[in-house]
């Protein structure tokens, strides 16, 4: 059995924007049918207890980035560094959580996931996506036209 820890950041934006807890709960709901996978959601920016890491296969963080990044609080970076570097714990960051200020946190994240969003260099435009036609492909089966507001990141620093 694999154990995935989903860490949702503290509320920080208006309703409907950067809904960290709701996003992680939705992701957990989608993953609960995966055979051999246990998913635990932790909110308020970190694990409910350090014991949660016991037996964990991977950690994913969906939270504010920059100076409010959960990895920069308390001993969080050191705790995960030991597990990622020495035990091979899987690690992922979602959306705003890929932004870290320059320093040890950014260097470690670069080593773990290959890069990070760098303030004043990377970009994150917001656009209205309107998808009217989808290709005939198995991955698009059952998907109909839709519109959404999308914020995407590019020029990530590797």
Feature map (PLM): residue ranges:
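C-terminal and late-domain segments of enzyme folds
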Residues: 42, 138-158
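A glycine-rich, often tryptophan-bearing local segment used as a flexible ligand/cofactor-contacting loop or short
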Residues: 66-145
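Helical hinge/lid and interdomain linker segments adjacent to catalytic or ligand-binding clefts
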Residues: 5-7, 12-101
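Extreme N-terminal starter segment of soluble prokaryotic enzymes
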Residues: 1-3
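Secondary-structure boundary/capping signal
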Residues: 35-39, 117, 147
């Amino acid at each position: 059995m694999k154990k995935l820890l989903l860490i949702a950041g503290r509320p920080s934006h208006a309703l409907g924007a950067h809904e960290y807890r709701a996003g992680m709960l939705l992701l957990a709901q989608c993953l609960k049918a995966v055979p051999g996978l246990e998913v635990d959601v932790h909110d308020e920016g970190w694990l409910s207890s350090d014991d949660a890491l016991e037996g964990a296969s991977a950690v994913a963080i969906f939270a504010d980035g920059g100076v409010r990044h959960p990895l920069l609080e308390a001993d969080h970076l050191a705790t995960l560094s030991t597990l990622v570097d020495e035990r091979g714990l899987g690690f992922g960051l979602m959306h705003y959580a890929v932004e870290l200020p320059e320093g040890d946190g950014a260097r470690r994240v670069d080593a773990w996931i290959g890069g990070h969003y760098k303030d004043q260099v990377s970009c994150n435009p917001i656009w209205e996506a309107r998808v009217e036609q989808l290709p005939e492909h198995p991955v698009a089966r059952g998907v109909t036209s839709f519109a959404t507001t999308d914020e995407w990141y590019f020029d990530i620093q590797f």
